[in-house]
């Protein structure tokens, strides 16, 4: 049974374009299925999490990451008697707006767009789901419920300063109450993302030999897990050891999140969802000690993994590809596919840049590489 402060699909604020309900799925389940059927969701399979897609079959990509986030979000929401369908749906959609090549690609595209109000993957997720996906005759986008769209836009908290242009524009026709917190389910999705990415980036980085177990000693709480597991299993292999460490880490983080969130709910005597939205802090959270550990782990990953020679070298190449494609298309829109070129008023530089950014952001890693080789390479074999 859902808690009184849960997002009840029967009490949804509805969709921008009214639709009749179905008898066999609730509104949030319908949204989950719509997201899974989008082209943008399928493309996540070929978009970078940390390692470029073709570097290895077992490294995570944006799709596997999104699926892992959704399982954590669903488990946490279920335990707290919240809507697991809503938490899962927001988690599945949270990375739809990412560019090819992960954060390196986003930084590169944002730099290209600095004269045109920049680029944000969060705003791009909203744009994909409300405009760019063309699956219905009656409207653009996939017409998701208010609760899902609110959760995607505000899962990291209220938006009050420097509101992204597209978010502000969309908000005029469908008020997402940007100055308040999102539902507890959306907050769960955001922290499920943290749990998944720090755990699995550690795992993938050890698998790629960017870091080793000796370097994990910098993170004392994780080093303690390593010690306990090696003490229990004397002859454990390195590959199995990292799986055990990650499993223990995820369990520890979820347990901590559940405990602190229950404490917050009891302390605030929360009885309805509006009280969650109007609080001056997010109700779903870790303990202070765990928040410090997460901050420490993110710093470790940033310094030892994301800034490593291997990742930096790849990031430089990815930056060159994104910026090269942007310049080529800006110089000659005839190089764009016909359906994209038709959207552009060639006399208006701003709208041209935004449409080109939408096109590049939707590319997979391999398609971006292929396009770059075709359009920017001096190798005549590519022509």
Curated annotation (Swiss-Prot):
NCBIfam families membership: dGTP_triPase (TIGR01353), PRK01286.1-1 (NF002326), PRK01286.1-5 (NF002330)
Signal peptide span: none
Record keywords: Hydrolase
Domain HD: 62-198
UniProt KW Hydrolase keyword: yes
Alphabetical list of Gene3D superfamilies matching this protein: Hypothetical protein af1432
InterPro entries reported for this sequence: dGTPase, dGTPase-like, dNTPase_2, HD/PDEase_dom, HD_domain, PHydrolase_assoc_dom
GO MF term (any one): dGTPase activity
PANTHER family xref list: DEOXYGUANOSINETRIPHOSPHATE TRIPHOSPHOHYDROLASE-LIKE PROTEIN, DEOXYNUCLEOSIDE TRIPHOSPHATE TRIPHOSPHOHYDROLASE
Family designation: Belongs to the dGTPase family. Type 2 subfamily.
GO BP term, example: dGTP catabolic process
Keyword hit for S-adenosyl-L-methionine: no
Descriptive protein name: Deoxyguanosinetriphosphate triphosphohydrolase-like protein
